[in-house]
Swiss-Prot record:
Catalyses which reaction(s): tRNA(Pro) + L-proline + ATP = L-prolyl-tRNA(Pro) + AMP + diphosphate
Organism, scientific name: Staphylococcus aureus (strain JH9)
Protein name from the UniProt record: Proline--tRNA ligase
Domain of life according to the entry: Bacteria
NCBIfam families documented for this protein: PRK09194.1, proS_fam_II
Classification lineage: Bacteria, Bacillati, Bacillota, Bacilli, Bacillales
CDD domains to which the protein is assigned, alphabetical: ProRS-INS (cd04334), ProRS_anticodon_short (cd00861), ProRS_core_prok (cd00779)
Similarity comment text for this entry: Belongs to the class-II aminoacyl-tRNA synthetase family. ProS type 1 subfamily.
Pfam families (UniProt xref): HGTP_anticodon (PF03129), tRNA-synt_2b (PF00587), tRNA_edit (PF04073)
Gene3D superfamilies linked to this entry: Anticodon-binding domain, Bira Bifunctional Protein, Domain 2, YbaK/aminoacyl-tRNA synthetase-associated domain
Length: 567
């Protein structure tokens, strides 16, 4: 394709709010253009990359007998009300109303809709298992879109849904999909690591995320260097081994602590290590207030709280709620309280006595507080995030951290949707049973960004061969010169029969063409310049920067060999 005919609006400067390298490079190289916050148009080069990604995805889905369909993005509220997610999903769900007053959502996922499609069709165990997938735009009303395609309000996804008669069948499809995802990410050129994760708003009993390692990743991966253990930090279990630091029990004292609001400020004020301070936070669980205690250097993990209490309806109490409940602001909270409120403490609080806690009075704290004498703990548990260097639950060693971008996730849904939506089949005994489900998502547009995030240098994108928008970049330095133009035209005609060629025939300065070529990042470059009359051209590899002069008689062999050896 001739570059003069392709819409590639490269930029010299990018908006300052473009923080991620992938966002900056996708804008700068003319692959995407922002419409409004969190919403982008995919321009010709990006569309070609997306087509290459989806072709790989389709191949791997068909390899495991997953069948493609296409469902509407617009979903009626009644389906979401059946599953209970219309009220539970939260403000991220894009809701709208038609002229007749009917409520709809622009789908972030399609569990409800696909369940409604199959519930009157898959009626016998003989029809199972069945796996359906689609590739489609999704919508989520992100509060703060950022990082370009990595956290947008409209995005492209591959979502698949499987239906089973028993858990063994679900396990097999889950494993097949897990392996397919591993192959997909390897093929598109992403270093992605599967990690144990939380199922979030989709629900289900078991899930893995596929995380593309990246410094700008919004998720922290906990992993072992001695085993294949890997988990999202939200799910990483903290191993408790008692390490009591008990001293002689001291009398309870109330001390003045002016302008002290955080655990670190309190530790500095008292001249004590922060891990000897105990923080108190108040949450609402299904509308009931509870207190949760952790040591000063630890952070409460609300995902673990949701798992512990078996509900998603957990939120941190607001400042007004806290003041109304205990008469003090959040920085002064403590468990010594004359109100009926259940108290839960992280396991590691047990290692301390003579605790330092808030006095439930602004400007004051209590020291030498002891469990059993001054207050009681209803239950201990693992309520916090793991720290780097702590022991891992598989016994393999200690926790190491890395940042990652979630590009895919696989879920075992069980009967969450089939039971609430009455999707049943007859088993081999003729008894009605709820369909057992799995769901499996890949962020296609996220994958595009993740590829760029992991495959770039200071000059621009470096596309992996499998997804590159074109194989070769043919550049005529000066098309006004007959010998250069004629040779470039001839090479374009020859190489276009075997490769996808982007032919830069523009009337631009050589420096502009070379800068754009580096920015766009096609794997191989053929430059027709001042030695065209001798039949000599330059061949350059984008990844290594290696270049050599080649006679046109040898050019097809050289290019073919180089292309075959590309990653």
């Amino acid at each position: 394709m001739k570059q003069s005919k392709v819409f590639i609006p490269t930029m010299r400067d990018v908006p300052s709010e473009a923080e991620a390298q992938s966002h900056r490079l996708l804008l700068k190289s003319g692959l995407i253009k922002q419409s409004t916050s969190g919403i982008y148009s995919y321009l010709p080069l990006a569309t070609r990359v997306l087509n290459n990604i989806t072709a790989i995805v389709r191949q791997e889905m068909e390899r495991i007998d997953s069948v493609e369909i296409l469902m509407p993005a617009l979903q009626q509220a009644e389906l979401w009300e059946e599953s209970g997610r219309w009220g539970a999903y939260g403000p991220e769900l894009m809701r709208l109303q038609d002229r007749h007053g009917r409520q709809f959502a622009l789908g972030p996922t399609h569990e409800e809709l696909v369940t409604s499609i199959v519930r009157n069709e898959l009626k016998s165990y003989k029809q199972l298992p069945m796996t359906l997938f689609q590739i489609q735009s999704k919508f989520r009303d992100e509060k703060r879109p950022r990082f370009g395609l990595l956290r947008g309000r409209e995005f492209i996804m591959k979502d698949a849904y499987s239906f089973h008669a028993d858990e063994a069948s679900l396990d097999q499809t889950y494993q097949d999909m897990y392996q397919a995802y591993s192959r997909i990410f390897e093929r598109v050129g992403i270093n992605a690591r599967p990690v144990v994760a939380d199922s979030g708003a989709i629900g289900g009993s078991h899930t893995h995320e596929f995380m593309a390692l990246s410094a700008i990743g919004e998720d922290t991966i906990v992993y072992s260097k001695e085993s294949d253990y890997a988990a999202n930090i939200e799910k990483a279990e903290v191993v408790y081994e008692p390490n009591h630091k008990h001293s002689t029990v001291q009398p309870l004292e109330k001390i003045e602590t002016p302008n002290v609001k955080t655990a670190q400020e309190l530790a500095d004020f008292l001249g004590r290590p922060v891990d000897e301070i105990v923080k108190t936070m108040i949450f609402k669980v299904d509308g009931e207030y509870i207190m949760v205690l952790v040591r000063g250097h630890h952070e409460i993990n609300d995902i673990k709280l949701k798992s512990y209490f078996g509900t998603d309806n957990i939120e941190l109490a607001t400042q007004d709620e806290i003041v109304n409940l205990v008469g003090a602001n959040p920085g002064s909270l403590g468990p010594v309280i004359d109100k009926e409120i259940k108290i839960y403490a992280d396991n590691f609080v047990q290692d301390l006595n003579n605790l330092v806690v808030g006095a439930n009075e602004d400007g004051y704290h209590l020291i030498n507080v002891n469990v059993g004498r001054d207050f009681n703990v209803d239950e201990y548990g693992d309520f916090r995030f793991i720290l780097e260097g702590e022991k891992l639950s598989d016994g393999s060693g200690v926790a190491h951290f890395a940042e990652g971008i979630e590009v895919g996730q696989v879920f075992k849904l069980g009967t969450k949707y089939s039971e609430s939506m009455n999707a049943t089949f007859l088993d081999n005994q003729g008894k009605a049973q709820p369909l057992i489900m799995g769901c499996y998502g890949i962020g296609i547009s996220r994958t595009l960004s993740a590829i760029v995030e992991q495959n770039h240098d200071d000059n621009g994108i470096v596309w992996p061969k499998s997804v590159t928008p074109f194989d070769l970049h043919l550049i005529s330095i000066n098309p006004k010169k007959d010998d250069q133009r004629e040779l470039a035209d001839a090479l374009y005609a020859e190489f276009n029969t075997k490769f996808d060629v982007l032919y830069d025939d523009r009337q631009e300065r050589a420096g502009v063409k070379f800068n754009d070529a580096d920015l766009i990042g096609l794997p191989l470059r053929i430059v027709v310049g001042k030695r065209a009359s001798e039949g000599i051209v330059e061949v350059k590899e984008r990844l290594t920067g290696d270049s050599e002069e080649v006679h046109i008689d040898d050019l097809m062999t050289v290019i073919t060999n180089k292309y075959d050896n590309l990653k």
